[in-house]
Amino acid sequence: MRHLQDLTRGLLSQNIHGLTFHFEPRYRDELAALVRQFIIAPEQHATLDVPEPNRGVFLLEGERKWVLKYNRLPHWKKQLQNYLGLKRVSGLHDLTNEFINLSAVSSRSINVPRVAGFGYRARFPFIKEEYLLLGFFDQHCSVDDRLIACPEDSRNLLPQVFRLFEQMLSEGYVHMDPHPKNILIGPDGSLRLIDFECCAHSVIDHDFSLGFLMGYFYHYWIKRFIALEDYRTLCERYLRDEQPNLERAVFDPVFERFLTKKVSRTTRYSILTSARHQAKFRRAPDTHP
């Protein structure tokens, strides 16, 4: 796990039931005790997402509340890649990657979770299990849950989401999976982002990235709550009022492609992390795979 040394250097290491953990020093004792309790009896902890055979998200409650994310890597090739850092990318769905991403962007933004610890079960040269400990956003609900309960809120909520996208870009990163379950609403109405397994650490082109975010957000989920023409109207109003310097020749083709068509995760990753791939996409957005 040498490729993570720069990220774990400031953390305190501890072995717990055969697992290696790196904890934020301020909370090491509390987190270590909570992790021990979880390892002994995971079934006694509340889940924060629908459990999957190899993945889970759990609530840990001590002096504070924490999120513990768990991921088991079933395939030897992925175990090898994550242990040795053979694929240093920001678009893979695993907790090693989310740890890397949040370590890169959390210092820039108050709207993302803070990393409290990272753990794994490994035997050279394979990592079998991953654990990620994060700060918990208490009394928040997802945009998805809010709109399921109150679909009529979409017209008031969407401009706030667009402003969150703009703030994200101004802070220099692009969340590649900005769907309504990954955006939380706080008790004061502020919005926050979670699930950073897929993230670009820099913004190649603001207008291109905003086109992706606003188009993808509709195609992935929000179309359940608002008609396409109504969504277009809200987008135009936001762009007119709050993005007067937007270059529409860049924004529009990207927005239209993501608004109405599915685009693979591989393509999303490549065009948001590589200037060369982004330029290629811009030349033929309608036909680019």
PLM regions and their residue ranges:
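Juxta-kinase regulatory segment immediately upstream of eukaryotic protein kinase catalytic domains
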Residues: 1-47
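Conserved ATP-binding subdomain of kinase catalytic cores across diverse folds
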Residues: 38-137, 170
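Short acidic/His/Gly/Ser-rich catalytic and metal-binding motifs that mark active-site loops
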Residues: 75-80, 141-144, 194
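Conserved kinase catalytic-core helix
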Residues: 94-95, 101-112, 144-179
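Short beta-strand micro-motifs enriched in acidic
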Residues: 121, 186-188
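A short beta-strand motif that forms the metal-chelation/ATP-contact edge
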Residues: 130-135, 190-196
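Hydrophobic residue at the +6 position relative to the catalytic HRD Asp in the kinase catalytic loop
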Residues: 181-185
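C-lobe/activation-segment region of protein kinase-like
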Residues: 192-288
